[in-house]
Every structure is written in C-alpha cells, then in structure tokens.
Amino acid sequence: MSTAAGTILTGKRRWFALIPVALGVAMIILDATVVNVVLPTLIKEVGLTTTDAEWVTAAYSLTFASLLIVAGRLADRFGRRLIFVIGLVVFVVSSVLVAMSDSPVSIIGARALQGVGAAMILPSSLSILNSVFVGKSRAAAFAVWGATIGGMAAMGPLVGGWLTTDFSWHWAFLINVPIGVVVLIGALVFVPETKDKASANGADVLGILFSTLGLLGVVFALIEGQRYGWVIATQEFTAGPITWSAGAISIVFVSLIVGVASLVALLFVERSRVASGKAVIFDLRLFKIRSFAAGNVVALVVSLGEFGLLFTLPLFLQSVRAYTALETGVILLALAVGSFVASGAGAAMAQRIGPVRVLQIGMALEALGIIGLGFAISTTVGGWGLVPWLFLYGLGVGFATAQLTGVILSETPVAQSGQASAMQSTSRQVGAAIGTAILGTTLLLGLGHFVNKDLQEAGVPSAQAEQITQVVASSAGQAIPGLGDPVIVEAASQGFSSATKTVSLVAAIFVTLGLLASFLLPRNAARIRAEGYEPPKG
C-alpha cells in the first residue's frame, strides 16, 4: 500500500524492516551507556584529565541534541532510509576513529562526530516505523523500539565492563562495526525509502542555523552549568584555542542567553515562513495537535528523572558496595529484563485499555521502582536487594517509552514523521540534560551534607571531615575505597548512601510529575491511526 509519504508494508516484510531499525537504535543507545564504564580506563591509558573525561560525554551529547530537529527534517525531505543509512555510516566510521585515537583531542572530536551520526539515526528510525507501519502493527513496532532503548540502556554497562575487562577499551567502540554492517545490509534490503514529496520547496537556512545554535547553547549550559558557574565563571574554560577566564561572566551564562535568543528567533522565522508557504525546519502547527503537544510536555518532564537512576546507581554500586563494572552491569540487567517483558505485553494491553492508560501504568511503576530503590539503598544492601526494584522500574520503562512515542506520533501526518520524531527525541534529550543537572547538583549537595555529618558523628575532627568530604564529592565517590581507615570509609559510605537515596527520591518526584502531566493527553490517542490525517491549519 502506498501513501503520499511512502509505502505501508504488509505481511512479513514489514517485520524484517523492523529488525535493522531496532538494531540501529540499539547500537547508539548501547554506545552511549558503554562510555560510562570505559571512561576510567581511558583516563589511565590515554591520559585524559577530569575535564577531558567529561568532554568525552559532553561532546557527544551536544552534537546529538542540537542536530536532532535538523536531521528529522532532512529525513522527511530527502528520504528517511537515506538519512538513516548516512547516519549509520557516520556513526560506524566515527566509532573506528574513537578506537584508533591516542590523544584526548582526537577522542573528543570523534565522539562529537558520533553524536552527528546518532542524531541522524534516532529520528529517522522512528519516522521509518511511523511511515511503514499502521494500526496495531505500528503499536507493536513502537513497543519493540521502546524496549530496545530501555534494554540497551541497562545492558550497556554489562557489555562495556565485559569488553573492557576481557579485551580492551578499543572493543567497546569497535563492536559497532559488525553491528553497523548488519544494520546497513538490512536497511538497504528490507527498509523502503519514504519521504515527504511536498517538502522540496526551498531550504530553511535560518531555521537550521537558529535551531542548531539554540539547542547547542541551551544544552551546553545545562551540561556545564554546575562545573563552570551559572553566572560568574568559577573556573577557566578551555576548548582548543578558546580560553574563558575564571572570575568573568560565565561562558555558561553567555551560552544560555545565546541559546534562548536563537530559539526565540527560530519561532519568529518559522511562523513567517509558514505564513508565506515556504519550507520550514519545524512546522509549529504540529503543536496544535493535542496528543503531540501534551506528549512532548510529558516526555520532557518524565525525562527529568527517568535517567537519573542510571547516572547515580552505578556510582553507588562501585564506590560503596565495591562491585566491579561487570558486576554492576549484571545487576542492571534486571532493568533490561523488565523492559523486554513489558514490551511484549504493552501492545496487547494498549488495544484493550488504550495506550494512555498503559503509559500511565508504566510511569507509576517507574516511580514505585525508583522509590523502592531509594529505600533499599544502604551500605550493606546486596545486588539481590536491588534487583526486584530494578525489574519493576524496567517494566515501567518498557510500558511507558513505547506508548508515549506512539501517542506523540499518533495524529501527526506521516509526511511530517521526521519532524515529529525529532521533536519528541529533543524533548527527551533536553529533559534528560535538565534532570542530570538537577540530580547532579542534588548528589553533590547531598554528599557535602551527609558525608560531612556522618564523618563528624564517627569522631573525625571537623577540619579533616571537611577535607575528606571535598575529596569524596569531587570524585563522585570514587575515592571512598582508598580512604584507608575503616571508620572513615564506613562513614563516607553511609553519607554517599544517604545522598543517593535523596537523588532517587527527587528522580521519583519528577517521574510522578510526568505521570500527572499525562492526564493532559486525550484518552483515545493512538488507538487507530487514520491515514490521510492532516494537521490543523493556521
């Protein structure tokens, strides 16, 4: 069956098309989480400084988040499979470049290039599914897509720990080569090309400029605000030939102002171009669709807390409980199992009670799982004490991720799938960046309070307790095992546990707010997608 935007596949072939799309998403999610495990080894073997290590992650996040909307629009205009394949090639080549790198600069540059590839893969993968699947099969495809994200986020530490421990850090990136080859062949053979044939009426150069600059500025500020100071620079910033001195107006503040101003300019430019009938990088009229507008609000809010768990829990397990990276990955597998179980049941449940209800059940399970983890965390808890709560959290992620994606895209025109997919991905990324900034600050403040308090209660002099607290906070707990004195180690571990509990409860509050926001969604969203639906005009 053909549509104006491409081909609706029927029979078994559509499920063959799902395989390379899901594997492509799995690859970028796996890579994003593997890096956290590999960083300590990179610091030792490549000579990365703490700042370099942070930029290995930040460079990827910046290019990824800032280019999602542009990549989504390019997919609609030039072909969703084409952009998916180009992104795949860029990602695999940059993975090889990371593995071959022998200096901080080359690693950071290659990671930034990886972000470019990932930004092309993610929105085009969703828009491919949205354009080639319809009805019940679309819900099932979204369920697989959502479970892939949740499962790979949990499996990343396990895979990274295994490859780094048994082989070398290079293989944590080289593993993308065989996966990429399989995905490339599958995409070329099974995935049909789809595009918006009505979009080829000029390039929105200003839209591309303002959207990229706006998201780059805002996301950079959110990532680096805690480190460099939100208004006044607390330390010198250096990036290649650029140096920003401490004591002056912070580069974070300037970046945030430029980013917000660019996004405001983007709104005016896009409204003007729509009124003139010209091509736009993003059609603002999509926000007149209730399921799309409310769904993006939910995506942003729930992402504030959804990924905070994967940020803090590995630190706790390795610093306080002294688990290895591989052992930590095994514990986190419970999350992946829960996510895959939920993906199998979610689509069928959505047909019976509606996707919005399944989404709300999922977010409720997420919140309960995080709260349970918050209360379970202690200096003596073992892996089995955390596994049930991780499994519950994984069930929630599996139910919520796919259903929210389906709801957001349920009433958007197939021809604008790339734009819509990119916006929901951007909402999640911006939410995750804000959440990481808030939860990171919460962790640091918690460490400063609880570690200092527990050390002094253990009889450590105030001045020494303050010094130890600074060491623990600056290392995000990694210095705890090396503190020596068992009394000090126990007190610092107790303080870190209390700080982690606080972070978990704050994350649960954010997920709960996302649950409350979900009641803004139309109850019948995404039950059956009507072909030929057109967005509201004007």
Regions found by a protein language model. Give the residues of each.
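A gly/Pro-rich, aromatic-decorated transmembrane alpha-helix motif that marks the paired
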Residues: A147, G151-F167, L216, F220, ...
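Hydrophobic alpha-helical segments of secondary membrane carriers
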Residues: V144-T148, A203-L206, V298, M423-S427
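Transmembrane core module of solute transporters
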Residues: K12-F64, L68, S168, F220, ...
